[in-house]
Amino acid sequence: MQGRLNRRVLVIEDDNDIRRLITESLRAAGLDVVAAVDASQALRTALARKPAAVVLDIGLPDQDGTQFVARWRERRPDANEVPIVVVSGRADRREIASLLGAAYVCGKPFIVDELVDQVERAVLN
């Protein structure tokens, strides 16, 4: 018997308004969303239960998104299988996303429907 599809998405975003927008939009699309405001909270959450996908802001208050990914993958090798959707306003976001092996990249500002579509594709692949 096949298990239920993991639809849990970890959203890591320090801006309250953006985090709320992403979280509510993904929930409206039927995804199970958990949010973190910084890398420390995100690491605890990701280690407790592996998400199906991660929506990651690169610029976080306690450490940058690349440091979060490195620590997570170091402590949980199967994290390499989890697709990452980078959401960032940084000019170098595509280069950083490439280094992380991210599945998708969204700039800020972003079109909500496009972000939701990318996250849904990441979860299903």
In which residue ranges do the predicted regions lie?
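Acidic catalytic/metal-coordinating carboxylates
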Residues: 38, 64-67
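Short amphipathic alpha-helix used as the core "switch/output" element in two-component signaling
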Residues: 44, 66-79
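Active-site residues of response regulator receiver
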Residues: 57
